[in-house]
Amino acid sequence: MADNSSDEYEEDNKEKKKPSQLTPQQGFSENDDDDDDDSSETDSDDDDDDEEHGAPLEGAYDPADYEHLPVSAEIKELFEYISRYTPQLIDLDHKLKPFIPDFIPAVGDIDAFLKVPRPDGKPDHLGLLVLDEPSTKQSDPTVLSLWLTENSKQHNITQHMKVKSLEDAEKNPKAIDTWIESISELHRSKPPATVHYTRPMPDIDTLMQEWSPEFEELLGKVSLPTVEIDCSLAEYIDMICAILDIPFYKSRIQSLHLLFSLYSEFKNSQHFKALAEGKKVFTPPPNSASQAGDAETLTFI
């Protein structure tokens, strides 16, 4: 009897649970209907958008062409971002519109011709014959003439040069300093003189080439001739020019010019400056005096 009563109790509970389980399913079905309606509305909107945009362009991205690629899921997810992207449509106005510029280019200030007449009544033609505009620093006519002469390289043309004179120079040191600075700037900007050799001479770049290893090895054993050698100045010039592969003739002026030009190039070279600063001076040990005499070298730059 106890078993039958328990079975009946379980059957009653099952019958009570059935309607309670059916009710949420009905609620879900109603929500699903709403979702279906929303999805149908969005689909219709998408169709309208597709109709507005028209047919896909030729050569456009098609996801179906890349579905068969053997790639990982992360790469496939990256490909999905291409279809998710929607570019913004910006309408550009290409109409030409006339406008008045804010600024009008002009040389100096616009002359309003509002001049104060001279006390004697004579016309000064200011603004007509003489330029009338403000300037913080006027050019010196003498310095300007020197600049033009230097740039044109017309030094042999006879012309009337303006000589600047300064009254009461002791009371005007600023004008003297300005003149010195102007002439110094002129000399600093002066291009190097062009020299044409009458005899065949090698190029500076050729003379700056590295010596052969045999010659450098020889310089490590035999030092270069110094000024203490017993010879004349002409013979010493011939020896130095011969070591540096500079040809010399009866007149050694051109050879000396090329020699000092080579010296100037080495002195102003950034490469050799860095080598000279980074090179350590070798100090031989005190017990090897003979070895130090053999290894004595002289760097000629």
Curated annotation (Swiss-Prot):
Its main location: cytoplasm. Pfam families: IFT46_B_C. One of its GO terms (biological process) is intraciliary anterograde transport. It is found in: Cytoplasm, Cytoskeleton, Cilium basal body; Cell projection, Cilium. Induction: By BMP2. The keyword Phosphoprotein applies. Residues 1-66 are annotated as: Disordered. Disruption phenotype: Short cilia. Residues 1-12, 30-52 have a biased composition (Acidic residues). Strongly expressed in ovary and testis, moderately expressed in kidney and brain, and weakly expressed in thymus, heart, lung, liver, spleen and muscle. Expressed in embryonic bone and cartilage, with high expression in non-hypertrophic chondrocytes and weaker expression in hypertrophic chondrocytes. InterPro entries: Intraflagellar_transp_cmplxB. It comes from the Eukaryota. GO terms for cellular component: centrosome; ciliary base; ciliary membrane; cilium; cytoplasm; intraciliary transport particle B; motile cilium. The modification Phosphothreonine is found at residue 283. Signal peptide: none annotated. Keywords: Cell projection, Cilium, Cytoplasm, Cytoskeleton, Phosphoprotein. Belongs to the IFT46 family. Forms part of a complex involved in intraflagellar transport (IFT), the bi-directional movement of particles required for the assembly, maintenance and functioning of primary cilia. May play a role in chondrocyte maturation and skeletogenesis. This is Intraflagellar transport protein 46 homolog. It comes from Mus musculus. The gene is Ift46.
